[in-house]
Structure formats: structure tokens, C-alpha cells
Amino acid sequence: MPYSINNLTNVKKLSGGSENTNYLITANNHHYVLSLFERKSPDHVKVLEQLLSHLNKNNFKTSQTVSTTNGQTITYWNKKPIIIKHFIEGKIMDALPNHIIELVGEATGKLHQVPAPDYLPKTIDYGQENFKLVNQYAPKTSFKDWILAIRRYIQPYLTIDLPKAFIHSDLFCSNIIISSDEKSVTIIDFEEAAYYYRVFDIGMTIIGLCSEGKVINQEKVKSFLIGYKKEIKLTPDEEKALQPFTVYAGAAMTFWRHRSFNYVYPNMGLKNHYKALQTLADYAKAQSSLFFKC
């Protein structure tokens, strides 16, 4: 191994997403996480490593990469990129209590104040710009009708000059490490980061952290917004756009799951995985705008 990580005592595969495979490595009583990127290009992984370095240099708490003995931060196995990061002590919870969600809101507000580097993508792979792809892979389906109806619904809000920032765009429970005393949180996994609408990130976090089954918990939404507003005050236009962008975020992830597991990487076990998020997007759309106020 080209790293100065010696005396390996344990390697354990971690549960994780479909985009990479993660292993917990123990050596010399220190823990590390090795991420093997199954589907990301070397260029994409290079940007991710640069982002982590950029975040740490700007005093945003997140993962820190480990360099090889000759200073490289990316290596390869079977032509697939690898990054090793220092393990962050803490826990991941499947459902977050309100006080933790408030901490995540505050951390998200801090993230949105980190200067966005020029190389940060200006769009997201599952954004509304790509919803039209449904015409190619799923024409004459009810899903096509649904996703294009959502696109029409959000169009008026895309013409507003809404603030953009360095966003995470994938803030679900699996990407948040909570300290043992539950007084701090660390946001990880910036693989989908972009320079995009702040309110999209807020909407995605509402979908990712504030949902309970088929509904969204309003008190959790309020907790997140209370934390966020400790760092950033929403503009009047963002206040108006929050509900549509929550719908947009839910639809975007629905689109990603539908396309990924039915067409790009067909998986019979996950073919209906998109429906839970579709239900949440519809739920958000059906609420009064007051639901998203705090």
C-alpha cells in the first residue's frame, strides 16, 4: 500500500450507496475509511478530493483525506479511483430528533457561506434540466407525465433570481455523522456538490431528514429552518420558492432513482424504490405554503 498506514488489524465493508464501496480500515489503533468509486470517473473523483481540501481550508468540518507517501490523494485499483479518509468518530442515525436537525440546519447555513470554487459543477445530474430524458427512456408512461408536470410547476420559480451557493444536494441521514454527546454534526459525502440554488439544498434536506414514512414532519422542518437562519436569512423570494423547491428536490431524487434502477442500472429489487420519494414530493406539493414557515 503506497500509504504510510501500517500494521493493518481489521478491514470491514461498510453499508453505503450504489456509487461507491466503502471499507473501514483499522491500523495502529487508528481508523480510516477507504472509498472505492465504482461509477465515478477519475476527473469526478479529483474534483471531490479538491472540494474536501477546499472545505477544510475554509474551516468547514468534514472528511479529511489521507495522502500517499509521495503526496498523492487518489490511487487506483483495477482502474477504479480510491480515496482514503480519516474516520470520523460518531454515529449515523436513521431518524434524527429535532435538536439534531437544528444543528444540521446551522451546518448547512455555514456550508452555503463557503466560497464556491470555479470547478464546482453548475448543474446537478438529476436536476430539472435532465427531466426531459424521460421522453427517451420512458415515453408513454405515467411517470413521464408526472415528472414533466413537476417541471412545469417549478418553471416560474426558476426565472426568479434566487441566490446560489456551494450546496451538498444529497443531505440524507447517511451523510450526517453525529457526535456521541449529540452536540455537533459533521456533513460528509460531497459527491453531488454543486454551485446551485440554496433553496434547492434546503428542500432536499427537508425531503431527506424531515420525512416520516409518507409525510413530512412540520416540526422537523421548523427545526431545520431555525438552525439555518442562525447563519443565513432567507430572501423573500426564497421564502416563496421553498415549497416548490422542496417539491423539486423530491422529484429530482425520484427521477434519479426511477432512471437509475429501471433503465441505467436495472435492479428488480429496487425498481419501485422511487415511489417513496414520489409520494413525499406529492405530499409537499399538497401542503399550504404556511407549512414551510417558521
Task: Label each residue range with its predicted role.
Residues 253-294:
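ATP/Mg2+ or Mg2+-diphosphate-binding catalytic cores
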Residues 1-9:
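Juxta-kinase regulatory segment immediately upstream of eukaryotic protein kinase catalytic domains
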Residues 12-16:
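Protein kinase glycine-rich loop
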Residues 27-118:
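ATP-binding pocket architecture of kinase catalytic cores
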